[in-house]
Structures are given as structure tokens and as C-alpha cells.
Amino acid sequence: MTLALAPTDRPYLPRGVRLVTDRVRGGIVLLAPEKAVALDAVGEAILSRVDGQTSLAALVDQLVEAYDAPREQIEQDVQAFLQGLRARMFLMVAP
């Protein structure tokens, strides 16, 4: 299985995985059973758009509109971030 996402893939958080506000540290955490990942601003910007309905291409389009960075760079960063989460079972993909 390849971890790369196709432009039409629709990433989503699997059952039991959710974004929560960590009131102690003042940030957003990706929480799963017995696992947690503190997110930086980039991770939060990406995952806040992951809903199971939005394709990878549309997600990248939204980020290109929101941030002043080249599309290719955003696409590479999003792909790498989501692949890492997918490898750790924090993310699933609907074709």
C-alpha cells in the first residue's frame, strides 16, 4: 500500500481520532486512543480542513488561497504531513 494521496482522495480522521484543544499547553492536539500529537500552526491549518468530503486538491486550493506560498510547496508539505499521519493510523482516505 502506498501512503501517497491522489488529488481526488478525501482524507478523514478515523473513528476515535479527533482534534482537541489542550487547555494546559494552549494548543491543538490530535488525540487517538493512547496516543496524542501536538500540532503546530501548519498541522492545525491542514487538519482543520480534513472532513472526509474535501479532496486533497481542494484542500490544497484552500491553503493556497489562505497563505502566501507557492502551490507546489504547499502541495508537497500537505502530502508529507498527511502521509506521516496515515502511516501512524491517525488518518484514513476515501477514494
Swiss-Prot record:
GO molecular function, one term: quinone binding
Domain of life: Bacteria
Pfam assignment, any one: PqqD
Family annotation (InterPro entries): PQQD (IPR008792), PqqD_bac (IPR022479), PqqD_sf (IPR041881)
The entry's keywords: PQQ biosynthesis
Stored Gene3D superfamilies: Coenzyme PQQ synthesis protein D (PqqD) (1.10.10.1150)
Pathway: Cofactor biosynthesis; pyrroloquinoline quinone biosynthesis
GO biological-process terms attached to the record: pyrroloquinoline quinone biosynthetic process
Keyword Secreted: no
Biological role: Functions as a PqqA binding protein and presents PqqA to PqqE, in the pyrroloquinoline quinone (PQQ) biosynthetic pathway.
HAMAP family assigned to the protein according to its UniProt record, in alphabetical order: PQQ_syn_PqqD (MF_00655)
Family (UniProt): Belongs to the PqqD family.
Cross-referenced NCBIfam families: PQQ_PqqD
Subunit organization: Monomer. Interacts with PqqE.
Name of the protein this chain belongs to: PqqA binding protein
Designated gene of the protein: pqqD
